[in-house]
Amino acid sequence: MENGKVKYLDTLIEQDDRENHVGCAGRVNSVEYDIYSSKNIEDMGEYKDLNGEVARLTDVIMKADKPFLIYGAKGIGKTSLVHHICRKNGISLVAFSCGIGTNKADLKGRLQVDKDGSYFERGILPTAFLVANESKHAVLYIDEIGALDHDVQKWLNRPLDDRHSCEAGGRKYTLNEGCKLAIVATTNPIEYAGVNNLTEDLRSRFIGQRWKNPTSTQLEEIVDWSDIPDASVKSPLLTLVEDIYALRQKADVEYILSPRDLIQFVQVYRDLGESSFSGDILEETISETILIKYTDPQEHELVKARCNETFGVSIA
């Protein structure tokens, strides 16, 4: 640090601290800490606290002594809440979105080659420890942890248990005294495509919450309904959400409508009303924001029939 500012090392640096080495170590990439600063966290808009989840997750993040898992459907604000808390409290955020192809190298790191030879590019786990030590307090946010294969999940065991460390590229990464790293993960319900159960040993490391889908009353709080007709648009839309959820419970459809879908609906409805669009605004909004989500032909026809009946429209 110089004059309170981060002085970046060269793009590649030599590992020192030989006592922490656990294997061969050489050049590694440097970390641009400003990327993870709370000042650079995206503003995802105001978060609506429905069930006291803001206070609970804030407490978990401030204590940073237990990994926390949020289990819930897509589009209900899991990511938004983590961003909101970190921005508000000046906490650095290291966010990582898991996918079907995420592997050990994404978590721990991988060897790369440049004109000077090989070097180790650190993955998200060692990066999180470095950011926490630099900023004194950071959150490692692992989005969609259930997308990880079981053999990849095991590499999270060590950072999430009482060892609070990881080994990568021949070096041990751990927290300095007085530094905190809160770990928050999210996952969608197991019935979603591409979602795996967490292994027992990984589950045993988490505490957490299971978030339910918002009720119609809560959806009225989340969505900005100003200038949206109640009888012809708002009420039928809320009814449709409940109907499609019932269809999902019977396994007739895979996709359920989330708050994100409703927000898209009212935004598109407004946009079309303010544009030069000459067709039926309600029917077009339904097609663009609801029916487009159902790619299976049988599900598409079923949901279209429900939309026609609920909204009193005639979408062909």
Regions found by a protein language model. Give the residues of each.
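C-terminal regulatory/interaction module of P-loop NTP-utilizing enzymes
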Residues: 1-316
